[in-house]
């Protein structure tokens, strides 16, 4: 009986330690990691570091998302491409899986679309709207249980970082 309790506490403690390692990165941490420019669809665009967010999963793998200046892109690209997503771990968005790598993303018409760096769509999932949010910001991650929300203003998608 005592052995079972000890084992149970070790399992609970191990789970808590793993969760404690997962965190949203601070602004200073993001500044050290974020690129100053991002290559997408044949061009490099300036990264809006102030509108870049990141997280670290329990294994220490980093995910960065940031907005870019799309003024040099064609209208067709600029309409759907708003930012970059760099991930060292597999991500899941509403059943759609994204392997480690570098991507473009955009929120448009109730959808969150992820594209490869050649601007080909990889997947689109429905985005949600958080009307209760008092002070929306251009881009941020927020913890949501064991997952995260990636916000662009009031629009968001839920993402799980493995």
For each predicted feature, which ranges?
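Bacterial N-terminal signal peptides that target proteins for export
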Residues: 1-10
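Detector for intrinsically disordered, low-structure N-terminal pre-sequences
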Residues: 10-11, 16
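Primarily secretory-pathway and cell-envelope proteins
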Residues: 22-76, 124-162
């Amino acid at each position: 009986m005592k052995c079972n309790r000890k084992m149970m506490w070790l399992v609970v403690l191990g789970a808590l330690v793993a969760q404690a390692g997962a965190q949203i990165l601070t602004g200073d941490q993001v500044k050290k990691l974020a690129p100053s420019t991002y290559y997408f669809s044949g061009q490099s665009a300036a990264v809006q570091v102030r509108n870049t967010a990141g997280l670290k999963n329990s294994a220490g793998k980093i995910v960065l998302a940031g907005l870019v200046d799309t003024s040099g892109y064609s209208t067709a690209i600029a309409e759907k491409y708003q930012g970059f997503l760099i991930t060292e771990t597999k991500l899941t968005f509403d059943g759609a899986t994204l392997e480690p790598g570098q991507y473009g993303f955009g929120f448009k018409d109730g959808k969150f679309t992820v594209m490869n760096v050649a601007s080909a769509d990889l997947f689109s999932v429905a985005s949600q709207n958080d009307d209760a949010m008092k002070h929306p910001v251009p881009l941020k991650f927020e913890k949501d249980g064991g997952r995260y929300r990636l916000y662009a203003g009031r629009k968001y998608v839920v993402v799980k970082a493995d």
